[in-house]
Amino acid sequence: MEISWGRALWRNFLGQSPDWYKLALIIFLILNPLIFIISPFVAGWLLVAEFIFTLAMALKCYPLLPGGLLAIEAVFIGMTSAEHVREEVAANLEVLLLLMFMVAGIYFMKQLLLFIFTRLLLSIRSKMLLSLSFCMAAAFLSAFLDALTVVAVVISVAVGFYGIYHRVASSRTEDTDLQDDSHIDKHYKVVLEQFRGFLRSLMMHAGVGTALGGVMTMVGEPQNLIIAKAAGWHFGDFFLRMSPVTVPVLICGLLTCLLVEKLRCFGYGETLPEKVREVLQQFDDQSRHQRTRQDKIRLIVQAIIGVWLVTALALHLAEVGLIGLSVIILATSLTGVTDEHAIGKAFTESLPFTALLTVFFSVVAVIIDQQLFSPIIHFVLQASEHAQLSLFYIFNGLLSSISDNVFVGTIYINEAKAAMESGAITLKQYELLAVAINTGTNLPSVATPNGQAAFLFLLTSALAPLIRLSYGRMVWMALPYTLVLTLVGLLCVEFTLAPVTEWFMQMGWIATL
């Protein structure tokens, strides 16, 4: 019997999302106009809370859909205007170009990145050294590339290796269902469980590595570019400005990586089983023998393009998004990717998030029009200049750990810039606040998958169920990093940021514009 029209509409609305989630969104959409009539300020804060809720529930439904519906309604009832949204999008065009072109550009360098991580995994036998290498490699790559892409590459390596061993363990050459362990005998299951623990720890080290490297440069995370543009900094300026906080945090983060592996705590310490290593080594040897000259040339070309990418970013030869576009053109031209559909696949990863970021800017427009953050900023600016840095860092950190850090960083840097332009703070203090905002947005956000897009990407990937990586387990494994990164970052903002920045100025390395 066919279902009713009403039931069909309900099932189509937000698809597979739970009924309670659909109902909650409908209640939000009904309440917002009513509360807006009574108090626009309260309605504005309610919208922000609802939007954060959609981000926190990203596993139930991709936030673009519910967040987009809330944003459309906000414009429709007058919380902001379509013109203001357009202005916000125009002001942040560089960030949208970064997401569209840089992420797509790196997609065409995946073969090189896969080669690097495969060599690391099979060449280094010490688990502590391997974990450190993965963390450092992810940090270095994320300083120049998009963190999502770096994590995507590591996921590809892990899924590939898991599939190779799973086929051997199940005695099936065509093992299509990697989640089906029914054909694996007891001995192999024990080894497989150990292998899962090994892969979980490597994935978490790599994920945290993207946060450690991503905070250091203006292209490491999308919000970094927003903050850099607001402060008028280029690549080198941004790196030096952040270094009083980010360099000590990087060192402590890497030490934490070694410590958790040494102590075998928080789910770390599992080594690669020797039987798995033998299987993977055989497969890698076979792959290397089958690699043609054409394949080798592709790797060499991608390495050269990587050098161009780093050089162009460091010398600021063009806007970041345009450099990404040049990578797409060079990589496709020189590696023989000419089919439109093959090129189009590169954009599937970044465009949903680009659309979501545009929705962010709609909510930012509401925040500006309704002056929602004015009381918080007013409270922070009442404190001494020294205390302002820690307060901005803490407020950013609290919100970033449960919400998307692009959203949080955009809000706070806009408010700080408005305070500077109104004369409430000096330009010098504003530049220090920009560092506190950037580090506060990036470092504590490793606490949950909601804060780090790379973590959320890992949690929703095909790999997560294979290696038994749940939301709770990810939060638990991230806990030592969360504590160390957050506390070291706070101490650096409190004690080293101002004096080291002053010393950089005296040396002539940086200057207040």
From Swiss-Prot:
The keyword Transmembrane applies. Keywords: Antiport, Cell inner membrane, Cell membrane, Ion transport, Membrane, Sodium, Sodium transport, Transmembrane, Transmembrane helix, Transport. InterPro entries: Na+/H+_antiporter_NhaB. It is a multi-pass membrane protein. Pfam families: NhaB. GO terms for cellular component: plasma membrane. Na(+)/H(+) antiporter that extrudes sodium in exchange for external protons. Belongs to the NhaB Na(+)/H(+) (TC 2.A.34) antiporter family. The lineage of its organism: Bacteria, Pseudomonadati, Pseudomonadota, Gammaproteobacteria, Enterobacterales. One of its GO terms (molecular function) is sodium:proton antiporter activity. It catalyses: 2 Na(+)(in) + 3 H(+)(out) = 2 Na(+)(out) + 3 H(+)(in). The chain crosses the membrane at residues 23-43, 52-72, 97-117, 144-164, 202-222, 238-258, 303-323, 348-368, 391-411, 447-467, 475-495. It comes from Escherichia coli (strain SMS-3-5 / SECEC). HAMAP family: NhaB (MF_01599). This is Na(+)/H(+) antiporter NhaB. It is found in: Cell inner membrane.
